[in-house]
Amino acid sequence: MKQFNMDAFRENLRECRLQAGLTMQQLADKINVRYLSIYRWETGKRSPALVHVVAIAEALGMSLPELLGIAVEEEDNGY
């Protein structure tokens, strides 16, 4: 199992939020948290709960592995 990379998450969160054209407040409104939560997650002062990570991925239209900075390897099924 791949390890969660908080630094990659922080960077991906900020980069993808900006690419989506969202302010911290707009993303906070989409996932029903306070602006300060987004700020703390992006600066690494706090780590989000899993429910918030899922909500962020959905709000930004990306997969959890992408958001978390986890490389997903395709399995070789021998076909």
What does each model-found stretch correspond to?
Residues 1-19:
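A short, Lys/Arg-rich alpha-helix, primarily the initiator
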Residues 21-40:
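Short alpha-helical DNA-recognition segment
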Residues 12, 23, 49-52, 63:
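Residues that mark the N-terminal boundary/hinge immediately upstream of a DNA-recognition element
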